[in-house]
């Protein structure tokens, strides 16, 4: 899996705790979301948003097939939404993602897109 630049620093600043919920507004290949899911076990959730449908599929496959050390990762912990983070309010409402402990936007360019 692609490891995002400044992953450690980003996770330290977000400081995800067990059972918290986060929005990853620029899911990409899911590296940040995977790290958040690891730290929010057992019942924390991530709403991952990406404009590119193919990227959502890649992230979902990588996260679901990862072997990180947690007691469970089911589809109810990772919620995927195709869209632009500029519509975050509508996307969170549509997905009934009400309680949010943090929001991540990685605004760099993906080497896959270049």
Language-model features and meaning:
Residues 3-20, 35:
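Conserved alpha-helix/loop element of class I SAM-dependent methyltransferases that forms part
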Residues 8, 52, 82-88:
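Conserved SAM/SAH-binding loop
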Residues 17-20, 86-105:
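A short acidic, Gly/Pro-enriched loop at the edge of an enzyme's catalytic core
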Residues 24, 45-50:
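Conserved SAM-binding motif I beta-strand of class I
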Residues 29-43:
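Conserved SAM-binding loop of SAM-dependent methyltransferases across substrates and taxa
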Residues 59-60:
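Conserved SAM-binding loop
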Residues 68-87:
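Conserved SAM-binding strand-loop segment of SAM-dependent methyltransferases
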Residues 100-101, 108-114:
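S-adenosylmethionine
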């Amino acid at each position: 899996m692609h490891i995002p630049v400044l992953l450690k620093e980003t996770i330290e600043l977000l400081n995800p705790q067990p059972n918290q919920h986060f929005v990853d507004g620029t899911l990409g290949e899911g590296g940040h979301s995977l790290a958040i899911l690891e730290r929010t076990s057992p019942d924390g959730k991530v709403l991952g948003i990406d404009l590119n449908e193919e990227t959502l599929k890649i992230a979902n496959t990588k996260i679901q097939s990862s072997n990180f050390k947690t007691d469970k990762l089911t589809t109810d912990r990772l919620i995927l939404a195709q869209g632009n983070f500029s519509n975050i309010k509508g996307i969170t409402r549509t997905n009934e993602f009400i309680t949010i402990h943090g929001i991540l936007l990685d605004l760099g360019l993906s080497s896959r897109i270049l």
